[in-house]
Amino acid sequence: MTEQSSKKASIMIMHDELCQVFNGLMTALSLQRAGAQVTVFFGSRGINAVHKEKIKELKCLPDQPEEEQIKVMARMEAMNLPMPEELLLMLHMEGATLLACPLNKEVFEFAADDFVEGVALADPATYYTDIVMPAAMNLVF
């Protein structure tokens, strides 16, 4: 792992479609390993990606025929790509900040212990001013 720099990266994951979650988490991990201070925010339906049970139900390409979904998942498995659970653990262990939207937590009636390890609730009073605005890049998935 590269030593962290002063560059900050803000990643927002707003969808619960597996490919988008995967791309957001892989981007976050790549930036973290390149030395950026990474914060990943899970809002809207993206909050499902950090729920202990719902993360297991994420679908790849849900708008495509089932055979296409199966082919893509098989290719990902053949490439030995990590699943979101593994990526979240890597990000947490490597020092990224993982935040869930407190509004969506209430809307979807999640309990505090529903989240995977390492996820905290974002502070609405400071999230944008302390995380988003100072970031060198803000990416949304």
Residue ranges of model-derived segments:
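Short internal beta-strands
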Residues: V38-S44, L99-P102
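A charged, amphipathic interaction segment
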Residues: P84-Y128, A136
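Polar low-complexity intrinsically disordered regions
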Residues: K8, V132-A136
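N-terminal beta-loop-helix "entrance" segment that forms/cooperates
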Residues: G46-K59
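Short, hinge-like loop/turn segments at secondary-structure boundaries
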Residues: K56-C60, V116-V119
